[in-house]
């Protein structure tokens, strides 16, 4: 339980929070999804490694707003250093009296790609195999141990403190191409300066490369990119001016997802990229649905 100072509670803005808050009075849970398993994504690791306090402060604010009785921080198995940092910092919160013991529990992930899906994450938190649940009911209605559970991403709670301090108008003042806000892009591939790039929502990949990544590596020509990691699809360089945001890529059969931008050059065979992605999904499919269970294997065998 958080030791809450008396103050007015802002109204949650997300639809999931609204569903969560409408549930009957009683214990409610909150989970932070730190299972950063999408290929090419590393922004959560960067933020937690450089400023874990901001993340934890945002977590406490979010838990206070939705009146959560307990919070699980579910971290990727491949991030043992981050797990150690968070557990040490949570102990400090307890010692200083900011939270009661066991209010925040850092859980080590199961190492499976599918556990990044919120209902599979809930199953894993409960000690079960990480398999997506049938919905409805949604996790905001029936989550951890059957209790209403709100699932947030790491980046969502990471920005809460700054938005509280500077106001929503500050955050919404950023954006391009009729989009609003900031996005954290995990940029990798054949650029001079890869890494986590905080850029306006709606920026195009061409502007992202030139303004934030120093351009392409010398001797490399930009030919294609992954706008949303392994599951987000592949787009040619001829479509490099599309705004990057949550609802701008569907017409091209792609989506931004976790904003993992992988830049591909003319030194790489696109067929090899596609084959590598199919091998990844062949290995990581949870096997629940036939197209995903059998499709990647068929694609790999066709290559």
Task: Name each region found by the language model.
Residues 58-60, 202-217:
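Short amphipathic, charge-patterned alpha-helical segments
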Residues 26, 83-201, 213:
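Hydrophobic alpha-helical positions that pack around
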Residues 124-136, 238-255:
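Active-site loop ensemble at the mouth of alpha/beta enzyme cores that anchors a bound cofactor
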Residues 14-129:
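Iron-sulfur-cluster electron-transfer modules
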Residues 26, 34, 45-46, 70-71, ...:
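Ferredoxin-type iron-sulfur electron-transfer modules in oxidoreductases and energy-metabolism complexes
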Residues 1-16, 20:
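Single conserved hydrophobic/aromatic residue that forms the stacking wall/gate
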Residues 215-229:
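Short loop-to-beta-strand transition segments
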Residues 43-54, 152, 197-200, 281:
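Short alpha-helix boundary/capping segments
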